[in-house]
Structure formats: C-alpha cells, structure tokens
C-alpha cells in the first residue's frame, strides 16, 4: 500500500494528512518532495493519465532523499490551479500494483474534494468574500471545518472499501493491515497455545519426518507439528475468517444522533458532483459542430417556441437511449410523453437547444418516478408500532413478508435486511415460510447462524438458544419443515404469536419463489396476506431481468387482492448490470411502488438506499 497522503498549499499549510499504516505523519517526505519540485520542476517530471486516473492528469516524481531517516520514494501528485493546492500520494517503489493503487487513491481524493466544493470555499476565503474573524483576518479554512471532517471520514471509508481491499496482499498483511512480523508473532503465540492444548489432551510425543525410502529423517518439535494441525481450533478460526468476509460494517452506514443506523450514500455525493460536471459539459458541447452555421443555430434559435415537430426526432432518440438501458418500451413511451406535455408550447431558454431542453425535462421525469421515501421513515414506523402495548403489556411485532420470482435473491436480501434491522437494535425473528424449495430452510439456518455470530462472538455455530431454536438473543429462526400452501399460512400465524410472546421486534417471513405468469402459483399469495397480515410486503426484483420486470411487478402487486398491494421493492444484483438500470424505472412505473434498497453484492453490508441522482445520471449518460 502507499505511504502517505497530503493536501497542502504552496505556502506549506497542510490541509489534510493521512498515513496509511497509522504511523506518525512524516513531514520529511513532504519537505523532500517540495525541495525536489523546486530544484527540478520539469526534467524529473512524468505525466500520468490512464483509466485509473479518472480523467485527471497526474505527475510522478522519484525523490532520492538526503535524509537518513527517509529513504528514496516516489510521489504521485496533482496541482490544482484555483486555488493553488498540491495533492500528493507517496509510495516506496514503482510496481504495477502500487502504481494502480496510488492512481486510484489520488483520483478518489480529488473526486471527494471537488464533490464537497472545498476548493470553491477556500477560494472565497482567499478573496475575502467570507466573514472575517476577530483579528480582521479571513483564514482559508474558515467555515469549512465540518466539510474537511466529512472529507476525512468519506475518504477513509471509500479507500478501505473499494481500493485497499482490492490491492492488499493477504500473504503480506493481516486483516487489520499489520505487517508480516507482527503476524508471525501472533502466529507463534497461537502455536504455543495449541501446543499446550495438545499436551493436555495426551498428545505428548514428538512428531517424525519420513524420507522417501521409509526411513525416519528426524524428530519434529511441537511447533512444527502445530503448523500441520488443522483440527477444531484452527477450523474455528477459518470459519471466523469466512464469516468476517460476509460483512464490512465500516462501509455499511453510520448512526445518526438519534441512534438510527442508516445505509451509507457516499456514492450519491460523488455521482451528484459527476452529474454537475456532465451537465456542464453537455451544455458546452450540445452536439453542434464548431462551424459558423452551428454557432448561429445554437445562439440565434434559442428562446424559440417548441412544437411537436421540433420534438419528434429528439424524443425518438431519447426513447431509443432509454430502451438500450433496459427501460421497457411502454415505460420509455410514457416518459417521453411526459416530456412532450411538459415542453410543447413552452420556449427554450437563451442559448439552449431543443434537444438539451428535452434532456432536462426527461431528467426531471425520471427523477419524479424514482423519488420515494428513505430508510429512516421505515424505522420510525417500526418504533411507533413497538411503542404501543396492549392490556397484558405486550407489543405486536412489525411483520415483513418477502416475495418475488425464483432465483432473484429473496433469502439473501432478507438476511441483509435482517442485519440492517439488527444494527438498529431490533430483535429479529426470521421465519422459514418457503416450504416448497428443497434446502430453503437450511439456507436460512446458515444465514441465522452467521447473523447470530456477528452479533455475539461467543455464539457457537450449531448450538441452540435457551428456547431450543437456532440463533441467540438477537436473531432466531422459526421453522416447521416442508409442506403445502396450508402449512405456509399456519407457520406464519404461529410465528407471529410466538414473536409476540417472546417479545421480538421484527418478523421477517421468507416465502417461496414463484413464476409471475402462473396463476396457480400466484393465487396462494392472497390467502397468505389475509392470514398473516404483514405490515410491509417487499418484492425482490433483480436488475438483470430487463423489460419483463414490468409484468412481474404488476402481477405481484395485483396478487394480494383489492386493498392490499406491495409496499416496497428491493432491486438485487445492481452491481452486475453497469449502466443498464432500466429495471428500476420499469418496476416503479408499473406500480408506483418505491424502491427501499438496492443490492450491490453478496455480503450482508451490500445494501444501499437508492441514489436517485446516480440512477438518473446513469440512465441519461
């Protein structure tokens, strides 16, 4: 990994500093960099621009330090012109992996810095536009301390989540980033502990090494033998490593002042700034060639009244663009009709073409379709219901039912939802209502074991809690085997009664996957909803399905009878489709049901609230 990151002014004022290994920041490195830059600003400089730099032009310096305590190193840097700031990442040697990591890190730093508008704020302070302090002086950091804290927090999270994990070598570093020497010490300590345990169980003899001819070469000491021991103690550590790989709490979210655990939306900030840049570029380069006629067409024909003939070719082009992004034709037609209703009879703004005006209107229409509530509203609703007690002093649980077609990831996303609820200090009962698919109950049992162990390190996998069920005091599995549709409603009613008696906050019901175009499979959903009466019915739809998502959403929304509809969507596998996010538009267009979360991976923390700006920007790109 790289050594250090620094952001500073030409006068030497350090605005941000970060040491990747958690050591004291080495000012000698930065001083050597500045000295080298002053003495040889051109001849030792190499321009770097590739896919990892994300559009930025970086420069590379190799510094042969004169200080004994600071060996030679490399510095990748970017010079911001207004205001003049240096962004520098130092690293030991030029290797393919280190070069990629430093380039990606510096690009991330600049994107976060720009998205928080820190340069603009510093420039205003330098120009004296902000209020002066008691000494009649404007400090360049005045009024931006909170944004700098945000920058530090966001950078650490995004670096750990998206860059460090990709470049760290598990053979050279431990999980917490320590160097091999400390790892070896810990390993030796564990080996000594293992040795002691073996002696206590009666394995007191030394091991032996055998040659190819069958003769004994020499005796093995206990430490050598312990290295070959893959018994229960080591297998437990392996299972813990496997479990740790299912979660990255730091990347999941932060608690609000009220204690609510919200899904993180740093990507929303980055995409918002990217959207601003894209919009600015589109305004500058609106498709007109740099000819005299193009100039006149752009400037003279602004402020014109739009009619249907003006929009025809533009809307056909926009419709085709939406369809290529997996938006269903009927949804694309609806959106372009909205644009037509919005623009016909209106005038374009000065210096603005009809096409740009139509794109702005389509962006607004997409934003209106995709804008729903956010996760904290759901938390408040749960807390409100749980605050009401009956005459016996008991509270009804808040009940979720998860539905969807086969193979979209219902059980996985139910488990992600369970983890999010557990982080908000709710006690969760997971109910196995998929009594048809072989292995469905066992799959949930594995998830419950994982969640129980994540909430309590002392939980032993395979053990039963004090009520004789899989799980612990935080999360538990309610199961009753396999059977027909009658068993499903019976399990649901029993689980709700059980959760009420045992004071569970949340009931999460996993249901069987079913084809949306098969009435025989869809019809039991109505009786299930009537009997179980869930507070929220969530459909899991996958981003890969494309235009068929319209019919899926309609059929599931209509399956529960009059007066009962879906409440939310979770769109899974959004990390697999790139820019083809049309499924989100299709499902919301077909039903008017909002998207609660999007799934972006297979771990319990790979759940995000929908960033509408990101989705719209992706669809319009």
From Swiss-Prot:
User: Where does the protein principally reside?
Assistant: endoplasmic reticulum
Region of interest: Disordered: 167-217
Localization: Endoplasmic reticulum membrane
One GO term in the molecular function aspect is:
ATP hydrolysis activity
Which portions of the chain have biased composition (kind: Polar residues)? 171-183
A Pfam short name: SRP54
Which InterPro entries would you find in this protein's record? AAA+_ATPase, Longin-like_dom_sf, P-loop_NTPase, Signal_recog_particl_SRP54_hlx, SRP/SRP_N, SRP54_GTPase_dom, SRP54_N_sf, SRX_dom
Gene3D superfamilies, sorted: 3.30.450.60, P-loop containing nucleotide triphosphate hydrolases (3.40.50.300), Signal recognition particle SRP54, nucleotide-binding domain (1.20.120.140)
Name a GO CC annotation attached to this entry.
Answer: endoplasmic reticulum membrane
**Regions of compositional bias (Basic residues) in chain numbering:** 185-198
Q: Report the membrane topology from the UniProt record.
A: Peripheral membrane protein
Residue numbers spanned by region SRX: 1-158
Binding residue positions for GTP: 404-411, 510-514, 572-575
Q: Which residues carry this modification: Phosphoserine?
A: 239, 523
* Region (NG domain) location: 398-620
Keyword annotations for this protein, in alphabetical order, are: Endoplasmic reticulum, GTP-binding, Membrane, Nucleotide-binding, Phosphoprotein, Receptor
Any additional notes?
Present with 2000 molecules/cell in log phase SD medium.
Family in the record: Belongs to the GTP-binding SRP family.
Q: What is known of its domains?
A: The SRX domain is sufficient for interaction with GTP-bound SRP102/SR-beta. The NG domain, also named G domain, is a special guanosine triphosphatase (GTPase) domain, which forms a guanosine 5'-triphosphate (GTP)-dependent complex with a homologous NG domain in the signal recognition particle (SRP) complex subunit SRP54. The two NG domains undergo cooperative rearrangements upon their assembly, which culminate in the reciprocal activation of the GTPase activity of one another. GTPase induced rearrangement of SR drives SRP-mediated cotranslational protein translocation into the ER.
Its biological purpose is as follows: Component of the SRP (signal recognition particle) receptor (SR). Ensures, in conjunction with the signal recognition particle, the correct targeting of the nascent secretory proteins to the endoplasmic reticulum membrane system. GTP hydrolysis may enhance the fidelity of and provide unidirectionality to the targeting reaction. It is important but not essential for cell growth. May be directly involved in mitochondrial protein import.
* Assembly, per entry: Heterodimer of an alpha and a beta chain.
Q: What is this protein called?
A: Signal recognition particle receptor subunit alpha homolog
Tell me what organism the protein belongs to. Answer: Saccharomyces cerevisiae (strain ATCC 204508 / S288c)
């Amino acid at each position: 990994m790289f050594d250090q990151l620094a952001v500073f002014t030409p006068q030497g004022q350090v605005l941000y500093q970060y040491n990747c290994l958690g050591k004291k920041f080495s000012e000698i490195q930065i001083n050597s960099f500045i000295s080298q830059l002053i003495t040889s600003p051109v001849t030792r400089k190499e321009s770097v621009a590739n896919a990892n730099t994300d559009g930025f032009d970086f420069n590379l310096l190799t510094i042969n330090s004169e200080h004994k305590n600071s060996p030679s190193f490399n510095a990748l840097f970017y010079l911001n012109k207004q205001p003049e700031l240096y962004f520098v990442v130092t690293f030991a040697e030029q290797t393919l992996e280190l070069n990629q990591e430093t380039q990606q890190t510096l690009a991330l730093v600049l994107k976060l810095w720009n998205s928080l508008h820190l340069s603009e704020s510093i420039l205003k302070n330098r120009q004296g536009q902000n209020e002066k302090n008691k000494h009649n002086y404007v400090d360049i950091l005045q009024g931006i301390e909170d944004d700098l804290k945000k920058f530090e927090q966001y950078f650490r999270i995004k670096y750990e989540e998206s860059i460090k994990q990709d470049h760290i070598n598990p053979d050279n570093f431990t999980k917490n980033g320590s160097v091999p020497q400390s790892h070896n010490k810990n390993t030796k300590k564990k080996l000594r502990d293992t040795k002691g345990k073996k002696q206590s169980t009666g394995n007191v003899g030394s091991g032996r090494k055998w040659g190819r001819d069958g003769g004994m070469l020499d005796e093995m000491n206990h430490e050598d033998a312990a290295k070959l021991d893959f018994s229960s103690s080591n297998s437990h550590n392996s299972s813990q490593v496997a479990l740790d790989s299912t979660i990255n709490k730091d990347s999941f979210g932060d608690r609000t002042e009220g204690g609510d655990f919200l899904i993180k939306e740093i990507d929303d900030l980055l995409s918002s700034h990217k959207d601003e840049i894209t919009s600015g570029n589109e305004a500058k380069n609106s498709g007109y060639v740099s000819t005299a006629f193009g100039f006149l067409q752009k400037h003279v024909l602004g402020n014109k009244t739009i009619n249907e003939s003006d929009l025809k070719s533009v809307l056909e082009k926009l419709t085709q663009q939406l369809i290529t992004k997996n938006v269903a034709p009927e949804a694309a037609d609806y959106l372009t009709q909205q644009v037509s209703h919005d623009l016909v009879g209106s005038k374009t703004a000065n210096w603005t073409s009809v096409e740009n005006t139509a794109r702005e209107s389509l962006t607004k229409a997409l934003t209106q379709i995709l804008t729903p509530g956010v996760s904290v509203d759901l938390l408040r609703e749960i807390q409100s219901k749980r605050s009401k007690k009956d005459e016996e002093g008991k509270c009804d649980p808040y009940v979720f039912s998860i539905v969807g077609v086969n193979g979209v990831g219902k059980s996985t996303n139910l488990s992600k939802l369970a983890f999010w609820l557990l982080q908000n200090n709710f006690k969760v009962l997971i109910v196995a209502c998929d009594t048809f698919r072989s292995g469905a109950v066992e799959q949930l049992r594995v998830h419950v074991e994982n969640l129980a162990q994540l909430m309590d390190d002392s939980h032993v996998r395979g053990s039963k809690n004090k009520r004789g069920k899989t799980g612990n005091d935080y999360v538990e599995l309610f199961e009753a085997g396999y059977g027909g549709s009658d068993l499903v409603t019976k399990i649901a009613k029993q689980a709700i009664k059980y959760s009420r008696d045992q004071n569970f906050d949340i009931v999460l019901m996993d249901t069987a996957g079913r084809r949306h175009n098969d009435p025989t499979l869809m019809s039991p959903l109505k009786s299930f909803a009537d009997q179980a009466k869930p507070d929220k019915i969530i459909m899991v739809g996958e981003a890969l399905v494309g235009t068929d998502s319209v019919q899926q959403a309609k059929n599931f929304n209509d399956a529960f009878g009059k007066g009962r509809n879906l409440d939310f969507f979770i769109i899974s596998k959004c990390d697999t489709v790139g820019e083809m996010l049309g499924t989100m538009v299709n499902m919301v267009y077909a039903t008017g049901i909002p998207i609660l979360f999007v799934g972006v991976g297979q771990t319990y923390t790979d759940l995000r609230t929908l960033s509408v700006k990101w989705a719209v920007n992706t669809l319009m790109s």
